[in-house]
């Protein structure tokens, strides 16, 4: 599945069925969605920030890992575009949370405890989910899971900073491989050329009005 850039309909359906039936993945979704759709607007913003800044990243680790080794390059380009979009979402929802908290300073301690508790819960679920997701993907499974979790802790700190809190996992985040961090750069491994037809940069088109003479073939 990871060695091909396109999957058959049967493989896609099997992956969907696996996701629906995976307990860790479903608990992971429930942990966030119960607050995302809850009645507390500030907790909703915390959930939205963690959804955009933390929960997406474990599944992107292996394609980035492969791209650092010259495989799945175009897939990594697409992932960088997705992550760029999600970075804006995470920053904005975190910004809105901080502005909302300024209007309710009496809730600062409550929401700080809520946020850190939710992040800890999600990190435990990420470890279980990543074990299910990547189990058997590579011969050195433990090294792979360790790399995933370092990457997840790195993004957990980014999520906390979006919410206005100090990073809590610097020791774990520091174990993220430098090549993975480099692969996140927007201009990393650009492949804008005739043959690939892809890349992780936005190319702005230029319009030119046609003249009558243009249609004289």
Feature names for model-found ranges:
Residues 3-217:
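Non-heme di-metal
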């Amino acid at each position: 599945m990871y060695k091909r850039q396109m999957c058959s309909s049967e493989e896609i359906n099997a992956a969907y069925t696996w996701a629906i039936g995976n307990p860790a993945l479903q608990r992971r979704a429930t942990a966030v969605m119960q607050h995302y759709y809850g009645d507390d607007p500030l907790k909703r913003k915390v959930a939205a920030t963690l959804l955009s800044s933390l929960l997406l990243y474990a599944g992107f680790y292996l394609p980035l890992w492969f791209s650092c080794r010259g495989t799945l390059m175009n897939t990594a380009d697409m992932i960088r575009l997705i992550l760029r979009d999600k970075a804006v979402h995470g920053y904005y929802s975190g910004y809105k949370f901080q502005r909302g908290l300024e209007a309710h300073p009496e809730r600062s301690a409550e929401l700080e405890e809520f946020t850190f508790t939710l992040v800890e819960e999600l990190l435990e679920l990420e470890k279980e989910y990543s074990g299910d997701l990547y189990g058997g993907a590579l011969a050195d499974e433990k090294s792979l899971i360790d790399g995933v979790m370092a990457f997840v802790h790195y993004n957990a700190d980014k999520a906390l900073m979006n919410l206005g809190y100090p990073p809590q996992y610097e020791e774990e985040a520091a174990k993220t491989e430098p090549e993975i961090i480099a692969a996140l750069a927007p201009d990393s491994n650009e492949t804008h050329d005739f043959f690939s037809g892809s890349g992780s940069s936005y190319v702005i088109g230029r319009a030119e009005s046609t003249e009558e003479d243009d249609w004289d073939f």
